[in-house]
Amino acid sequence: MNYLEFEKPLSEIEGKAEELRALARGNKEMDVEKEAAALDRKAEALLKDLYKDLTPWRKCQVARHPDRPHCKDYIEGLFTEYMPLAGDRNFADDHAIMGGLARFNDNPVVVIGQEKGHDTKTRIERNFGMARPEGYRKAIRLMDLAHRFRLPVVTLVDTPGAYPGKGAEERGQAEAIARATQKCLELGVPLVTVVIGEGGSGGAVALATANRIAMLEHSVYSVISPEGCASILWKDAEKMREAAEALRLTAQDLHKLGVIDRIIKEPLGGAQRGRRETVEAVGKAIEMMLKELVGRKPDWLIKDRRNKFLDMGSKGLAA
């Protein structure tokens, strides 16, 4: 288990309990279960206290936790007959975005998501979830297929933002993001999104201009990272806590503002402490969102999606 900075007291208690049990495994005559159980109760109480009222900055830390389920985990856990598509038919295949045809509850869908990777090798391969233009163009290809075959689209968002490198800019990063956002708005099929970790800037919006948007309880969704915001506004990245407060990037704030439609509860201690339960909860949320939309006419779906985003400026964010 990887512990976050604010979880250090918890790591000490759980570490002691594990040490006691390890000693008992090496010496059958030792009876440490009573002491270990007491430490377990203490750890659970502390965990509840730590997660009772997380600050926006702490939610950012939880959203970035390396042990949270990632896009690949959700696809493997919720979808069957997954057939990935590769490449943008123009430049290359971007591994930061994965997607393809699949079945969800036995019904055909198109699933698209950003994948960060779980270890050093896969994180480098996936570019830490930061897509290049070819990734967004691959997403457009998939959405075109969904539109042609009348398949609902499910997107899973988890990115710190689109890749800001020189090559990406030269190949039209801004244009690719804009085209992907435009494609979302034009789709005549149901489009639902779940923010499973970080939803960073236009790199997230390009996959999240949806009819229905859900966020995991401790995920975040913002125009910029707290560190980036602090660097621009205060010329000091260390002011990320103040920036996180000001950005109103938590699921709870965004639900109040009308930016998202649903909050998916996470297990105590975050998705990383209950990966299977989290995947199942996301599956139920996707099922409920699709039920609201499947069977609707294309014109209705397009109008619903457009009005959702147009209304943000007059009803939610402007309030």
UniProtKB/Swiss-Prot annotation:
Where it sits in the cell: the answer is:
Cytoplasm
Main localization (coarse): cytoplasm
Question: Could you cite one Gene Ontology molecular function of this protein?
Answer: ATP binding
**Protein's job:** Component of the acetyl coenzyme A carboxylase (ACC) complex. First, biotin carboxylase catalyzes the carboxylation of biotin on its carrier protein (BCCP) and then the CO(2) group is transferred by the carboxyltransferase to acetyl-CoA to form malonyl-CoA.
Main enzyme class: transferase
User: Per UniProt, which keywords does this protein have?
Assistant: ATP-binding, Cytoplasm, Fatty acid biosynthesis, Fatty acid metabolism, Lipid biosynthesis, Lipid metabolism, Nucleotide-binding, Transferase
Please name the InterPro entries in this protein's record: Acetyl_CoA_COase_a_su, ClpP/crotonase-like_dom_sf, COA_CT_C
Q: Where is the CoA carboxyltransferase C-terminal domain?
A: 38-292
The pathway this protein participates in, as annotated, is: Lipid metabolism; malonyl-CoA biosynthesis; malonyl-CoA from acetyl-CoA: step 1/1
Enzyme Commission code(s) on record: 2.1.3.15
Q: Which PROSITE patterns match?
A: COA_CT_CTER
Q: Which Pfam families match?
A: ACCA (PF03255)
Task: Offer one example of a GO biological process linked to this entry.
Answer: malonyl-CoA biosynthetic process
Origin species, per record, is Cereibacter sphaeroides (strain ATCC 17025 / ATH 2.4.3)
- Primary gene name: accA
Q: Quaternary structure per UniProt?
A: Acetyl-CoA carboxylase is a heterohexamer composed of biotin carboxyl carrier protein (AccB), biotin carboxylase (AccC) and two subunits each of ACCase subunit alpha (AccA) and ACCase subunit beta (AccD).
| Stated name of the protein | Acetyl-coenzyme A carboxylase carboxyl transferase subunit alpha
Reaction(s) the record says it catalyses? N(6)-carboxybiotinyl-L-lysyl-[protein] + acetyl-CoA = N(6)-biotinyl-L-lysyl-[protein] + malonyl-CoA
On whether Disulfide bond is a keyword of this UniProt record, the answer is no
- What family is it from? Belongs to the AccA family.
Q: Which domain of life is it from?
A: Bacteria
Which intervals of the chain form a coiled coil?
A: none
UniProt entry tagged with the keyword Nucleotide-binding: yes
GO terms under cellular component? acetyl-CoA carboxylase complex
Enumerate the HAMAP family for this protein: AcetylCoA_CT_alpha (MF_00823)
